[in-house]
UniProtKB/Swiss-Prot annotation:
GO BP field: adenine salvage; AMP salvage; purine ribonucleoside salvage
Function noted in UniProt: Catalyzes a salvage reaction resulting in the formation of AMP, that is energically less costly than de novo synthesis.
Species of provenance: Aliarcobacter butzleri (strain RM4018)
Name of this protein: Adenine phosphoribosyltransferase
Compartment annotation: Cytoplasm
Keywords: Cytoplasm, Glycosyltransferase, Purine salvage, Transferase
Family annotation (PROSITE patterns): PUR_PYR_PR_TRANSFER
Main location: cytoplasm
Catalytic activity annotation: AMP + diphosphate = 5-phospho-alpha-D-ribose 1-diphosphate + adenine
Subunit relationships: Homodimer.
Protein family: Belongs to the purine/pyrimidine phosphoribosyltransferase family.
EC code: 2.4.2.7
Length: 185
């Protein structure tokens, strides 16, 4: 994982304190990290966005791809700050034009994510950052990264607000993309 422009411990604690924990949601035994309390906390949200802007301003990015749905919040905000394009990675069936799709395994079954074939305006050799709110087992992120690579663009890094480190999703994803996680949970 990259170590360039890592957030300091005090700032990490501010972000952690702004994320609400809800036990047994969406089902018993799950500990859910609710980012809505970070999003509606102007100080915490802007601290995070300032950090991401500082980290990525020198990466020469052309696009930021955000994973549905919570990745959209951070990806679109950062794309706006960096004055570059935002590309949504959607669940299957949510995009209206011609798409490519990637299947991935869930705990009980499979799911799929997709991108428009022209998501990057048919440009080649562009630099793309992938963003989502959390990486757990890495299935969704791995599928999203594979989709981006299939369109012959440069996946510069995959960024997550939170990493559930015990489940090794970031480690798995690091096989195909550099990974940066703001917070380790």
């Amino acid at each position: 994982m990259s170590e360039k422009n890592v957030l300091d411990e005090n700032s990490k604690n501010i972000l952690l304190d702004s994320i609400r924990t809800i036990n047994d949601y969406p089902k018993p035994g799950i500990i859910f990290k609710d980012i809505t309390t970070l999003l509606n906390n102007k100080n915490a949200f802007n601290l995070l966005m300032d950090h991401l802007e500082e980290r990525y301003k020198s990466y020469n990015l052309d696009y930021i791809a955000g994973v549905e749905a919570r990745g959209f919040f951070f990806a679109s905000a950062l794309a706006s700050r960096l004055k570059i394009g935002f590309v949504p990675v959607r669940k299957k069936g949510k995009l209206p034009s011609t798409t490519i799709c990637e299947k991935y395994e869930l705990e009980y079954g499979f799911s799929e994510v997709e991108l428009h074939l022209d998501a990057f305006n048919n440009e080649k050799n562009v630099n793309v950052l992938l963003i989502d709110d959390i990486i757990v087992s890495g299935g969704t992120a791995y599928a999203a990264a594979n989709l981006i690579k299939k369109l012959n663009v440069n996946l510069v890094e995959s960024c997550f607000l939170m990493n559930i480190a015990i489940l090794d999703g970031a480690k798995k994803l690091s096989e195909i993309s550099p990974v940066y996680c703001v917070l380790e949970i």
